[in-house]
C-alpha cells in the first residue's frame, strides 16, 4: 500500500479505517422504509416509498421498477446552497448521483419478483462532510429491505425480490497516500477520487474514478480497490446488523 511515514489523516484515522458508521431504521413514519445513515459527520435520510404500477416502458412486463432521487438540504454545507427547485433547474451532479443510486439499488433487487410495483428511493443529505453518495447507497439498501418487507406483509409482492446487500464507499489518493472513506477536508484536496459500489459477495456494481489532480498507476488502483473492498465488507456488516440478519 502507498504510504508515507510522515503522513497523517485529517481526523487521525488509519488510512484503511472507516469513519464511525451508524444506521437508524424507522427514522420517519410515513414511508415503507426510512433510515438515517451516518458516516462520521455526513448524515443522509434515505426513504423507500411504494407506488402501485410501473413506468410506461415497464407496463405489461410483469416486472417492477426502482427509481431514485438525491438532493441536499440548503444548510447541509457550511455555506447555504439555494434549493435547486427554486432555481428552476436540477444540477447535472444531482442527476448523476440520482442515477448512480438507482443503478446501485437495482443491483440489489430482482425486478421480476417485484410484480408491477415501483419503489421510489429518496436520499436527502441533512449534513455533508464527504461521501454523501456512498452513504446514500449504503443507507438506502436498508430502507429498501424494509420497504420490501412491508410489500410482502401486505401480500403485494408475489416473490422474494431482495438480493444480497449492496454498499458503497469512497477511497482516494491524498498526498500520494491511499485513504478510505474521505471526509470533505480530504476529498476536496485528493489527487485521485474513487467511489466504489460492491455487493456482499465482493462483486462490483460500479466504479467511478477520476484523477482530480494527477494520474494514477494500476498498482495504486489495485490498492484503492483493496481498501474499498474492506470498507464495503464493514458496511455490509453494519447493514445486516441494523436489519437483524
From Swiss-Prot:
Catalytic function, reaction form: tRNA(n+1) + phosphate = tRNA(n) + a ribonucleoside 5'-diphosphate
Keywords: Nucleotidyltransferase, RNA-binding, rRNA processing, Transferase, tRNA processing, tRNA-binding
InterPro entries: ExoRNase_PH_dom1, ExoRNase_PH_dom2, ExoRNase_PH_dom2_sf, PNPase/RNase_PH_dom_sf, Ribosomal_Su5_D2-typ_SF, RNase_PH, RNase_PH_bac-type, RNase_PH_CS
Binding site for phosphate: 93, 131-133
Gene3D superfamilies membership: GHMP Kinase, N-terminal domain
GO MF term (any one): 3'-5'-RNA exonuclease activity
The UniProt record lists the keyword Nucleotidyltransferase: yes
Enzyme Commission number: 2.7.7.56
Tagged with keyword tRNA processing: yes
Protein's GO biological process: rRNA catabolic process; rRNA processing; tRNA processing
Record family assignment: Belongs to the RNase PH family.
Role according to the record: Phosphorolytic 3'-5' exoribonuclease that plays an important role in tRNA 3'-end maturation. Removes nucleotide residues following the 3'-CCA terminus of tRNAs; can also add nucleotides to the ends of RNA molecules by using nucleoside diphosphates as substrates, but this may not be physiologically important. Probably plays a role in initiation of 16S rRNA degradation (leading to ribosome degradation) during starvation.
PANTHER family in alphabetical order: EXOSOME COMPLEX COMPONENT (PTHR11953), EXOSOME COMPLEX COMPONENT RRP41 (PTHR11953:SF0)
Assembly notes: Homohexameric ring arranged as a trimer of dimers.
Protein name (Swiss-Prot/TrEMBL): Ribonuclease PH
Gene coding for it: rph
Amino acid at each position: 500500500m502507498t504510504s508515507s511515514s510522515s503522513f497523517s489523516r485529517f481526523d487521525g484515522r488509519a488510512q484503511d479505517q472507516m469513519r464511525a458508521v451508524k444506521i437508524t431504521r424507522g427514522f420517519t413514519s410515513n414511508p415503507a422504509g426510512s433510515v438515517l445513515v451516518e458516516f462520521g459527520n455526513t448524515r443522509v435520510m434515505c426513504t423507500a416509498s411504494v407506488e402501485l404500477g410501473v413506468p410506461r416502458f415497464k407496463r405489461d412486463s410483469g416486472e417492477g421498477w426502482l427509481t431514485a432521487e438525491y438532493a441536499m438540504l440548503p444548510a447541509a454545507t457550511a455555506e447555504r446552497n439555494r434549493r435547486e427547485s427554486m432555481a428552476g433547474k436540477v444540477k447535472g451532479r444531482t442527476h448523476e448521483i440520482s442515477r448512480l443510486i438507482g443503478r446501485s439499488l437495482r443491483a440489489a433487487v430482482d425486478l421480476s419478483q417485484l410484480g408491477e410495483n415501483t419503489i421510489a428511493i429518496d436520499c436527502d443529505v441533512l449534513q455533508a462532510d464527504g461521501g454523501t453518495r456512498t452513504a446514500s447507497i449504503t443507507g438506502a439498501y436498508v430502507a429498501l429491505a424494509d420497504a420490501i418487507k412491508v410489500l410482502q406483509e401486505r401480500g403485494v409482492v408475489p416473490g422474494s425480490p431482495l438480493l444480497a446487500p449492496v454498499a458503497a464507499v469512497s477511497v482516494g489518493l491524498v498526498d500520494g497516500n491511499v485513504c478510505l472513506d474521505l471526509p470533505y477536508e480530504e476529498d476536496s484536496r485528493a489527487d485521485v477520487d474513487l467511489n466504489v459500489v460492491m455487493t456482499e459477495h465482493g462483486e462490483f456494481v460500479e466504479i467511478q474514478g477520476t484523477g482530480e489532480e494527477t494520474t494514477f498507476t494500476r498498482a495504486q488502483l489495485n490498492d484503492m480497490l483493496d481498501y474499498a473492498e474492506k470498507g464495503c465488507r464493514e458496511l455490509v456488516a453494519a447493514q445486516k446488523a441494523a436489519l437483524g440478519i
